[in-house]
Amino acid sequence: MFCLLCLCLTLGVWAFEPFRFAVVTDIHINVHAQTPSDDLRQTVAAINSDDSTDFVLVTGDIADAGDGASLRMAHDLLSKLNKPWYIIEGNHDQNWSESGCMDFLKIFGYERFTFEHKGIRFIGIPTGPMMRMAMGHVAPEDIDYVTSVLRSNGKGADAEPVFLVSHMPMQPADVDNWYELTDAIRPYPVVAFINGHYHRDLHFTYDGIPGIVNVTNLRQKGHSAGQYNLISLAADSIRVYTQAVGGTRHCWLTLPFTTHNDDDSTHWAPRPSYAVNDDYPQVTEQWTRDQGAAIFSSPVVWNKRVYAADNAGRVVCYDHEGQELWRHQTGARIIGTPAIGKGIIVVASADSCIYGLDAKSGQQRWCVRTGAPSVSAVTITDGTAYVGSGDHRFRAIRVSDGKVVWQADGIKGYVETRPLVIADKVVFGDWDNTLYCLDRRNGQRLWTWQPPNKDNMHYSPAGCWPVAADGCVFICDPERAMTAIDLNSGQQRWRTYQSKVRESIGLSQDGRRLYAKTMQDSIVCYAADGQAPRELWATDCGFGYEHARVMLVEKDGVVFASNKDGLIMALDGKTGRLLWKHKTGNTMINTVEPLSRNRIVFTNEAGKVGELGVRS
C-alpha cells in the first residue's frame, strides 16, 4: 500500500507527457582524422530519421584537440540535425584550447545552457579542467549559475523536475569539488545527472543522486558506425537505450523517475580530509579572499601588493593584508600569469588583447591587439615583456608604452608557458610539439627542438616553464621525461624517464639543482648538469597520483610545490627533507609565489587568493 501511495504521489506531482531524447557524447572530431566525423555524420542521419526523438544533448569532448577547426567541423555536422540540440564542453575542449575556449563560445554561442521541455528542466555546465592538466572542476561561477536557475525553478509542487548535464561524472576521482555541486542542488527537485567521459555506459550515484554515463559516439572495434543513447522519460520511469547506428537497440538501464534521492550522508562519498593540517600546526592561513571566479594563473607580488587574474577576465589587486584595492575588467577570461615591470602589470587576455595596466591604480596604459586570444604567461626583463598568443606570433613589447619591439611569426601552436629569458635568448614551448629559441634582440629563430613523439600534440613541451643552468635548457614534458637541451645549439644533451615526472620543474636559486614533481607521491631533485642526469634526492610526500602542471619554486633554501588536490608542500632544497604540508582546499593550487621561507602567496582553481604563514 505504501509503495502504491508513493507511486500515486509521483504521478500526481510529476505529471507530464512522456518523451524521448538522444545523447551524443565524446565525438572527438579531428580535422586530420576521417573516422570520428564519419561516425557523427551517420549518427546525425540516424537521429534525423527517428521522429520519436524530441531533441539531442551533446555532452562534451567535441574536438579531440580542442582546436577551432575541429569545433567548426563538429558544428557543421551537428547543424544538420532536424531537431533542437544543446551542447557543452568536455575536458578535451577545455584543456587544450588554442583560444582559451573562446572558439567554443564563438562557434556554439554559449558555454552553459538551460531549457524546459514538456515540464522537465535541463541545465548544462562545463566541468573542466580549464587549460590545465588537473582534475575536473565546477567553477564557482558555474555553481552560481546552476543554483540561480534552481532557485528560479523553485522547490514546491509546481517546480519542474531537473536533469543536470555535464561531461564529467560527479565522482571524487573525476571532479575535485563534486560535493560543492551535489550539496548545492540537494534541496531542489533534481532527478539525475547525464554525463559522458568514460566512453561506455555506466550507472553511478553521486551522493545519492543518480548519474547516467553515456557511451561514446566513436565506433566500437570491428564496427563500421558508431552508437548513441536514447533516454525515455515517463512519469514513473527513466529508461536508457544504446542505439547502434544501422543496428539494434537495447535497454541497459531502468530507473524510477523521482526527485527523492538518497539523503543518508553515510552513503555519500567521503568529503576531503584536512587532517594533514593538524600534523603541521605551525602553518596557518594568514588571510584568504574568494575572488568569485576560477583562477588558473599564479599570483603576482609587487610593492607589498598581490595581484590575481581570473576566469571572469578581471585583474584584482590586494594589499598585503588581503584588502581589495582595485580591479580591472578585460573582455574575456585570463589564463596566463601576468608580470610586473616598470610599475606596469602586463596581462594577456582571451579577448585578443595584451594589456598594460598601471600597477598602482589599475588604469589601462596601453593595449596591443592580437589576431587571436592569448593564454600565455608573461615574462618581463629589462623593461620588455615577452608573451605568446594564439595567432601564431610571439611578441616582445616595450612595457613603458606598449610598443611592439618585434614579433616572431610562424609559431605553429599556441603558447601557454612562461617564456624563459636567458642572456640573449628567449625560450618557450608551444602546443604543436616544438620548443623554440629566439634571439632576444630581434626575434630571429635560433633553433627548435621536438620530443620523440612529435606527431602527437598531447606530448608537447608546452606546459612547463623552462629553466636554464650549466649552458642548458631543462624541461619536463607529458611523455614523463626530463630533458637537457644545449642552450646555444638546441641539441639534446640528455633525456631521462627515470623518475616519471610530467610538466612540473623548478631551479634552485643558486642554479645547481633541478626540482621536479613525479606522477606518484614524490618530489625529486637532480643536479643541474648538462652532461648526464644525476638524481640527488627523492622524497615521498604522500600526495598520491599527480598530473597538475604547476612549477616548483625555491626561496631561502626551501623548495615549494603544490598539487591538484589543494596541497602546498615545503622541502629543504639541499636534502629533500619534508618540512611541512598544508591543504588549502581540494582543487589545483597554481604555482605559488613565496615571499620568504615562511610566507607564501597562493591562488587556486576555486578562485581563492591567500597567504600562508609559517612559525619558525
Q: Residues of each region from the PLM?
A:
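Extracytoplasmic beta-rich repeat domains
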Residues: Y280-V300, L325-G341, W366-T381, G390, ...
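Extended active-site neighborhood of metal-dependent phosphoesterases/phosphodiesterases
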Residues: D67-A159, E180-A192, L202-N214, H223-A234
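Structural signature of WD-repeat beta-propellers
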Residues: D310, S349-A350, S389-G390, D430-W431, ...
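N-terminal active-site segment of His-dependent metallophosphoesterases
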Residues: L9-M73, A159
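Binuclear metal-dependent phosphoesterase catalytic core
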Residues: I209-V276
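Short loop/turn segments that connect beta-strands within beta-propeller blades
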Residues: D319-Q323, D358-G362, R398-G402, D439-N442, ...
